[in-house]
Amino acid sequence: HWALGRKEANIWEKSPGQVVSDADLAVDRFLRGELEKLVPAAGWLSEETHIDHSGAGDELTWVVDPIDGTKDYVAGKTGWCVSVALVQNEAPVFGVLVAPAMNETWVGRAGRSATVNGRALVATQRRQYEGCRIPAESLPPDMKLVAVPKPNSIALRMAMVADDRADVVASTRWGHEWDIAAAHVIAAQAGASVTNALGETLVYNGTHGKALGVLCCSPNLYDEAVQRIGKYVSENGASH
């Protein structure tokens, strides 16, 4: 029922700053029913039903965010998507992002090329940090970086790196793996570097579902990005 510019009526906060709508719950129910039929052996971990950890630690698990970027969804903006990943042995092996408001479908599969609307993705290979593109509403001029449009969905921001629309996406928030699992496999298969904010391997389908931020960037900027983020975290700490 989403429409550009129309605000969603049935929304509430499940925790401070964490918005949920009727649509989140409806999509969650629909996806769980369909995906469990598709791979009956797989466990289930999603944003809306993460209290159920019956699947945590299973070899195969669906890791799902029914609407990533809910704030944009409920505000009638386009920067949201449905994020579905299949995780095997703690790594995402298949991921899909469906962004209906942008008419884009992103698909990634381990060992295969990633695509958007069927077109092969080639991630940014930028080498120079100064002047690199960062999804942001605004950036201080002294940073010498270029702000590009920022969807509320972290998954779509990572997808921008996968399609050479942005060069670095970083978050130092304690986030959740359902936000990034699908985008991780898409960006990695497109040639981007993807780790947690401190440059450590992201491990999926742990029982807590949490991850210390994410870094998704040109492989040629990765070392410098890790240094910059590490310095920031040591000075400011990680945010929640």
Can you name each region flagged by the protein language model?
Residues 56-115:
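DPxDG-like acidic metal-binding loop motif
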Residues 2, 24, 35, 70, ...:
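Residue-level signal for inorganic ion chemistry
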Residues 116-122:
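A structural micro-motif at secondary-structure boundaries
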Residues 122-240:
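An extended, acidic
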Residues 1-67, 234-240:
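N-terminal subdomain of lithium-sensitive/metallo-dependent phosphomonoesterases centered on the IMPase/IPPase/PAP
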Residues 6, 80, 108-112, 188-189, ...:
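A short, compositionally biased
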Residues 46-48, 118, 198:
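Short loop/edge segments at beta-strand edges and connector loops
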